[in-house]
Each structure stands twice: as structure tokens, then as C-alpha cells.
Amino acid sequence: MQIMDYQFPYCSYPYNFSDKIKFCIGKIVCKTFDVIGIKIYSKITGIYLEPEKISSYNLSDTNHQISNEKNLIYSNIKWLIVGITIIPTIYYGTKLQYIPESKLWYIGTPLVFMNLFNTLSHICQYIQLKLHTDKLKHNIEITNSLENPICILDSIDYDSIISTRKLIWSTTKVNHNYVVYNAFYSDLFFVFDREKMLNDFILEKLSKLSENDIDCLANDPSRNRLVQQMQDEFIRNKLYLLLMQCYRHQYTNSS
């Protein structure tokens, strides 16, 4: 799977301090190599990789290319050591007149410089690829950090949450009135001037409503009229019971 070079404005690479240090050092080293002609040499020898080509690599391609660059660096270092070893040998050979002095430049020196420039070219490519790898890994971390909350959200049973909230009634005080409102349908509410009346209404009426009853009440075009009717009926019944209790109390006392 190819990892696209996504840009995250709030956390683009390099993001943290260590990434910035690594990024700056890598860029400074590569720029120094360019100044001494490594870039031109690598283009002539075909070692150079265009930045656009490196940017098109996914993580797997980049790791494979990094492995190749490592092998080429080790190989050129070995030949560089061989060249460095040959030069003193030829030098002492010329002193002892076993080898003509001109052979020093024809055999040892070109071998040293060629492998030195090859090594530096591959090191520059290695640094560029490592920076690209760090950028890809950073983008993958950001992508995963975005995907994890999404997976959590997808696993939530919203229907159950909604059903639960529809059966919850909350209360608040507005000026001198007491208000009870539905936790899901916030525009479904009842207003009372006495707190005890409100609490009794919740206990005796609202707590006994089913989810379907609440849906029907909230979505009914004449909801306001039904709400007022429901509240008036409750108050009327309460007053009737209160009068009956008073009447019973008087009747008992008079007896």
C-alpha cells in the first residue's frame, strides 16, 4: 500500500525538536556535499536520485533503496581502503625504484578519489532517503492517530445512547419558574411555578412515558397544545386530589 504524502498543517514534518535537529543536520550535510561537487559527480555517474523520485517512494520502496545504499557505501569504503593501501605501497616502490613514479597517479590516486566520491554520493542519497522515511512514518502516525478515534466512534452504539437520552428528564430553574426538559429533545419542556409540582409531574407522568410516547409527543405538529394539555390535566388532577383530601379531613373532624 502506497503511503501518500499528506500534509497536516498543525503537525507537518519535522514536528518535534529531535526531528528538526535531524532534518537540519541532514540538509546541511547534503548541501555541503553539493558545494564540493558531489551532486554533479553523482549525476554524471548515474548515482543521483531526483527528489521527485524519492518523494514517490512508499515506505517499502524507501527501505529497500536504503538497504541498497548501505551495501554500496560499504562496498565503496572497502575499495577506498584498498586504494589508500595501494598509494603508500606504490610510493615506497618508487623510492626503491621498483615502480615508475608516474604509476602512482595512474593506479592509486584515481581509485581513491573515485571511491571517495562514490561513497559520499551514496551517503548523500542515504540521508535523503532516511529523511523521506522519517516523513512517511510521521504521516503514518498522524493517520493512525486519526483512525483510532474514528474506529472508536464507529463502535459506539448510538441508537442505544439516543434511546437512553430520550428517557432522561433534566430540570433547571429559570427566574422564578421550574423547568423540566428532555435530554434528547431539548425543545420538549414543561414549566411549573412550584418545584414540588414539577417533581411529582416527573415521577407520576414523565417517568412512565415510553420512548415511542416521547417520539410521538416531540414530533407531533400540535406538540405545544399537547404539552399544555398534559400539564393542565396533571395540575387539575392534583388540585382535585388536594380538594378531596381537604374535604375528607373536614368530614372526619366534623364527625
Curated annotation (Swiss-Prot):
Q: Which compartment or compartments is the protein found in?
A: Membrane
- What is the name of the protein in this document? Uncharacterized protein R342
One GO CC annotation, please?
A: membrane
- What are the disulphide bonds in this sequence? none
Q: Which organism is it from?
A: Acanthamoeba polyphaga mimivirus
Q: How does the record say this protein sits in the membrane?
A: Multi-pass membrane protein
State which residues carry a glycan (glycosylated): 16, 58
Transmembrane annotation, as ranges: 72-92, 104-124
Which keywords, in A-to-Z order, does the entry hold?
Glycoprotein, Membrane, Transmembrane, Transmembrane helix
| Primary localisation category | membrane
